[in-house]
Structures are given as structure tokens and as C-alpha cells.
A protein has these predicted regions:
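Activation/maturation switch segments at domain boundaries
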Residues: 1-150
Length: 150
């Protein structure tokens, strides 16, 4: 059998910050520190058995929107829905999304920090994958907040 598992979240605008931050993580199957979905109500993430390299085969779907597919008008779907390499993490997917998606998902202040290059995607999360509050982020990097007028 497999000795490793990979955390796979859903690539869309409804994915929780916690699941997005953990997407692509690989653990030994018996590692007590591994995170086992569901991590919250309505969690759609899964653990997938993988080899030691953690690589997946094929593609995975994405929806560059916070709406459910059935709620996206048919004429908009071709621009918002598609497939990416299965090894694309939420962080990598996020970099490819448009400004509207990024601002909606991060919120206006975090988006400004991200867009101005002050904060990489990972910097918004603590080591446990929890989203830092704006106050916590301000304590981590008061200079950036002052310079951007946040």
C-alpha cells in the first residue's frame, strides 16, 4: 500500500483559507501531525494516497469564482472554469487568478499587501495554516502597513 498522503483542496473561491494553505502538503500516513479532513463544516478537501514524492497524475478542475458552477451564467463559464495539472496547489492557482478573484478571496487590505509585493501568499497564514488577523499581520510587518496606508 501507500505510505504517504497528500492534502487536496478544491481550487475555487469558496475554499477555506485553512484548506487553501494546506493544499499540496504531504505527510507519512502514520504521522500524528497530519491534518485529516473534514477540517470544518462543509469541508470539501480530501487526503489522497501518494508515493513519497507526493506527485499526482492527471488534471484537476478549477473554478475562478466564489459562486457555485450552477450559479455562474453559461456564457461566463468558459473563462472561469477549466483544468490544471493535478499537482497545482491552491497557492499556484491563486497566482494565476485575476485581480477580482484575488481581492474577493483575500479581502481588500490583504489584497493590497499581496499586490504591492509585501506579502507572499504563505505569509498570511500561521504555521498551523490559520489565517492571521489584520492586527496580527500589522504586528508582523508594521512598516508595510504604514507605507501602504493600511
Amino acid at each position: 500500500g501507500f505510505e504517504y498522503v497528500r492534502f487536496v483542496s478544491v481550487l475555487d473561491g469558496r475554499t477555506s483559507k485553512l484548506c487553501a494553505s494546506l493544499d499540496g502538503s504531504v505527510w507519512e500516513i502514520n504521522d500524528p501531525a497530519k491534518r485529516v479532513p473534514p477540517l470544518h463544516p462543509n469541508c470539501r478537501s480530501i487526503l489522497v494516497p501518494v508515493e513519497k514524492d507526493g506527485l499526482l497524475v492527471g488534471e484537476r478542475p478549477f473554478v475562478m469564482d466564489e459562486r457555485r458552477v450552477k450559479d455562474i451564467p453559461k456564457e461566463e463559464r468558459s473563462q472561469l472554469i477549466g483544468q490544471l495539472d493535478a499537482n497545482t496547489t491552491f497557492k499556484e492557482f491563486f497566482k494565476k487568478t485575476d485581480d477580482f478573484f484575488q481581492k474577493e478571496w483575500l479581502g481588500p487590505k490583504r489584497y493590497k499587501l499581496y499586490k504591492e509585493g509585501r506579502f507572499d501568499f504563505d505569509k498570511f497564514f500561521d504555521p498551523e495554516g490559520r489565517l492571521y488577523s489584520l492586527d496580527e499581520l500589522r504586528k508582523l510587518d508594521e512598516k508595510s502597513f504604514k507605507e501602504l496606508g493600511l
